[in-house]
Amino acid sequence: MDIERKIELIKKKPTEELLTEENLRHLLEVGAPLQHYIGFEISGYIHLGTGLMAGAKIADLQKAGVKTRIFLADWHSWINDKLGGDLEVIQKVALTYFKEGMKQSIKVMGGDPDKVEFVLASEILDKGDYWQTVIDISKNVTLARMLRSITIMGRQMGEAIDFAKLIYPAMQVADIFYQGVTIAHAGMDQRKAHVIAIEVAQKLKYHPLEWKGEKLKPVALHHHLLLGLQEPPVWPIESEEQFKELKTQMKMSKSKPYSAVFIHDSPEEIKQKLRKAFCPAREVKYNPVLDWAEYIIFREEPTEFTIHRPAKFGGDVTYTTFEELKKDFAEGKLHPLDLKNAVAEYLIELLKPVREYFEKHPEPLELMREIKITR
């Protein structure tokens, strides 16, 4: 596969940002090993924004010949008070429910879960030289910068935090260099940590990325954050700037069950959540149902997406591109309820293998149901 095709696959939806394409091209041209990683806190049920968005991108990366890795961030989850801040529980969930859920998500999005390496953070944090890397990074970043970066944890700037949380951004950056990662992957909400990684890359003494005597910068790949199904905290949204400010609050959240569809939700739960979804008629800019259609259903174009309607409401209609769907919705030719029902049916069918897996292997899900889910 040539370099242009590899770049095309890596940039494909749901990629929203690549820092930078020039650096990626350089890594490909010099023949540097392409090692991907995406790190996850272990914090509750896997929703589509985690499972399907990451799974889709992992599938693309595999097709481009990249080695893929999922980093199960148990210590980071402990620092961020996930699952009651119980490290033992976090580790148990990471190696059962979360690992299996991500494998099934990757599979339904066209990837090969057997080609994904799963690494528990404890496996590398127990090594003494990991902490040398954390200190090395910390010496190259100001305290003010670290404080601004705590938003990667879902925390607000200015929020009262314990000191452990200040170590978190440096640990996340260290994870990249210590594992020899050349493609650091996450949702757009993790951007601040990745920018630090790029900026300190050529200053590090411990575990820098090196290839044939050259210190390399990692590529940061950020995928789209699916909008939550709930109404935005402010409506109407007056400007693109206001939308950017609200976007993190509008993303799917496992602590707000009706904002998210989980990978193992029943058909009835999926229908119910989509029925309640915020989907104003003719609204195409800030519409979570259209957002899901664009990034899940129309990730590959052309495709065939059929909306079934009674003849008196126009009968069945099939769309092959997202722009066709968006245009009809904007012009009022497609009713919100018809769109919601069709998206629900698509998701029910897409997630069927995941449901079947957890029906045959119920123990991981039963474990999750017994555990208090924290934000």
Curated annotation (Swiss-Prot):
A biological process term (GO) from this entry: tyrosyl-tRNA aminoacylation
Q: Name one GO cellular component term.
A: cytoplasm
Show the SUPFAM superfamilies listed in the entry: Nucleotidylyl transferase (SSF52374)
Question: Annotated Gene Ontology MF terms?
Answer: ATP binding; tyrosine-tRNA ligase activity
Q: Where in the cell is it found?
A: Cytoplasm
Classification via InterPro entries = aa-tRNA-synth_Ic, Rossmann-like_a/b/a_fold, Tyr-tRNA-ligase, Tyr-tRNA-ligase_4, Tyr-tRNA-ligase_arc/euk-type, Tyr-tRNA_synthase
This enzyme catalyses: tRNA(Tyr) + L-tyrosine + ATP = L-tyrosyl-tRNA(Tyr) + AMP + diphosphate + H(+)
Question: Protein name, please?
Answer: Tyrosine--tRNA ligase
Instruction: Give the species.
Output: Thermococcus kodakarensis (strain ATCC BAA-918 / JCM 12380 / KOD1) (Pyrococcus kodakaraensis (strain KOD1))
Its gene name is tyrS
